[in-house]
Curated annotation (Swiss-Prot):
Family that this chain belongs to: Belongs to the pyrokinin family.
Modified residues (Valine amide): 18
Keywords, alphabetical: Amidation, Neuropeptide, Secreted
Any one GO BP annotation for this protein: neuropeptide signaling pathway
Descriptive protein name: Pyrokinin
Subcellular location: Secreted
Keyword Secreted in record: yes
Coiled-coil segments on the chain, per record: none
Function: Myoactive.
Domain of life of the native organism: Eukaryota
Length: 18
């Protein structure tokens, strides 16, 4: 992802965008 939210791709590793 990454298109829907700034941390969409990061959420795969870190969980929901904090």
């Amino acid at each position: 992802d990454g298109a829907e939210t700034p941390g969409a791709a990061a959420s795969l590793w870190f969980g929901p965008r904090v």
